[in-house]
Structure formats: C-alpha cells, structure tokens
C-alpha cells in the first residue's frame, strides 16, 4: 500500500489555528464499546476491531491498494513491519465471518474480531476521508 498524498497530513509544529482545526478533525475509537465517534459532531458508529488493534494517537494517511475487498484504498494509521493497521470499509472476502451482520450487532463481543484493523460502514468511511487524527482508547 502506498500513500495517495505522499505523506501523513497530521504534523507537529503547525500554527495554533492549524492545530485547532486538525484536533477538530479527530475520531476516537473506544475499544471497550467497539465504537467510533467523530469529535466535531459527536456522532458515534459501531465498528469491527480486534484484540491487536493498537491504542494511542495516530495521524491518518490515505493509502491506495489493489488488494481485493478494500475498494481501492484504506486509511492507514500505524505501520508494523509489513502490516499496515488501517481504517477501511467492512472487508467481506470471507462470507463465513459475517462481518456485515457483526458490525450491526448491539453486542460488543460480536464486533471484536479483526486482525487489528478497524472496519467501518461505507458511509462512515467516506466521512473519515476528511479527518486527520485517530485516538484509540
């Protein structure tokens, strides 16, 4: 996977107004609820996560991919060796995993099942393309 823009848009040392805007364009994933919330409008949505989903604060980078099931791109947030932890649309390449059913489940335990990436609905993904910071708690 390669960055579309060439580099992450979140950077240290920016003027205060820029930092304030970047912080407004932040999303928070609460792993205890398997839920993603947008900091600016406080809307929250269920997500699929995994026990390996890393916690912390990360810059978001749009990455193109030709791997099947990702719709051509993912939003990367942490690289570990050859593995990119990313936010992406619900990955449905293994039907028996029932990911669409699981993301709609009210049970948090149903939504903890990925290898560490964060799966979101198509509508949430499109909104995420305009955000800069991810905080996983």
Please annotate each region the language model reported:
Residues 8, 15, 52, 58-61, ...:
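Compositionally biased, intrinsically disordered low-complexity regions
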Residues 50-60, 94-99:
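Short, surface-exposed linear segments at secondary-structure transitions and domain or protein termini
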Residues 43-44, 59, 85:
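Short, isolated positions in well-ordered beta-strands
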Residues 64-137:
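Exported/periplasmic cell-wall-interacting domains
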Residues 1-55, 136-137:
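Intrinsically disordered, low-complexity
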């Amino acid at each position: 996977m390669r960055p579309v823009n060439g580099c992450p848009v979140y950077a240290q040392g920016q003027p205060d107004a820029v930092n304030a805007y970047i912080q407004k364009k932040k999303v928070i994933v609460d792993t205890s609820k398997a839920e993603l919330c947008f900091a600016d409008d406080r809307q929250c949505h269920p997500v699929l996560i995994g026990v390996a989903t890393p916690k912390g604060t990360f810059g978001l980078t749009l990455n193109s991919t030709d791997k099947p099931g990702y719709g051509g791109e993912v939003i990367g947030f942490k690289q570990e060796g050859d593995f990119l932890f990313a936010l992406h649309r619900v990955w449905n390449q293994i039907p028996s995993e029932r990911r669409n059913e699981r993301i709609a489940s009210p049970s948090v335990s149903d939504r903890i099942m990925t290898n560490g990436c964060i799966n979101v609905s198509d509508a949430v993904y499109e909104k995420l393309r305009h955000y800069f910071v991810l905080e996983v708690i």
